[in-house]
A protein has these predicted regions:
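Short, non-ligating residues that shape and space the ligands of small metal-coordination modules
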Residues: 23, 178-179
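Sec-dependent signal peptide recognition
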Residues: 1-8, 22
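Extracytoplasmic c-type cytochrome modules immediately beyond a signal peptide or single-pass transmembrane anchor
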Residues: 39-164, 179-181
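C-terminal motif of bacterial Sec signal peptides marking the signal peptidase cleavage site
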Residues: 14-16
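The canonical Cys-X-X-Cys-His
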Residues: 165-177
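Processing junctions and N-termini across compartments
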Residues: 11, 163-166
Length: 181
């Protein structure tokens, strides 16, 4: 994220060179930085390429993160099906899912695909980076909303948001996750 902000700020500074303030109309500096950051994100939605030991490290972090999300979601599934759900266990699992989901955008830089090592991440992730990034953002949002529902303690709301989170996971996994090896 810091890289995108820096790129956006650089884009703003370069685009502003030689222009007087009144030439900018009513576009604020904030909106110009946001536009630059958005353009930078669109140009490289999965981040900068990595290789070697760094690629292997990211792949390991990705694998462990996804395993942890899966383990936490198993707790959620068990509890929401229970006649007497343990909301505390759901809250803990939801917080873990949300925390990890917010990190997931950095788990798929170019150079961490199936040609590098064992992974269930399909090559299509890097062939369709904008679609993948959009699905990842939807997952992050669903995880955030699920966590908010868990904090509320309302089991019906928790169940509804768990369904939405499951759909977000499935949308990405159906397109971008290979079967187990």
């Amino acid at each position: 994220m810091k890289v995108l902000i820096a790129i956006g700020a650089s884009t703003l500074l370069v685009s502003a060179c030689g222009q007087r303030a009144e030439d900018e109309g009513d576009r604020s500096a904030t909106s110009r930085v946001a536009a630059g950051a958005t353009a930078a994100a669109a140009a490289a939605p999965l981040g900068r390429a990595v290789s070697g030991a760094r690629a292997k490290q990211i792949m390991h972090v990705r694998h462990e993160g996804m395993e942890s999300i899966g383990d936490a979601f198993k707790v959620v599934g068990r509890e929401i099906k229970s006649d007497n759900p343990n909301v505390g266990a759901i809250r803990t699992a939801a917080a873990s899912i949300d925390r990890l989901a917010q990190q997931s955008g950095g788990w798929f830089p170019p150079g961490t695909g199936p040609n590098v090592g064992k992974t269930r991440a399909k090559a299509e992730i890097w062939q369709k980076p904008r679609d993948f990034a959009a699905k990842d953002k939807a997952f992050q949002l669903a995880a955030r909303e699920f966590n908010a529902a868990a904090v509320s303690g309302d089991i019906d709301e928790i169940r509804g948001e768990a369904t939405d989170l499951d759909k977000a996971c499935k949308a990405c996994h159906d397109a971008y996750r290979a079967p187990k090896h």
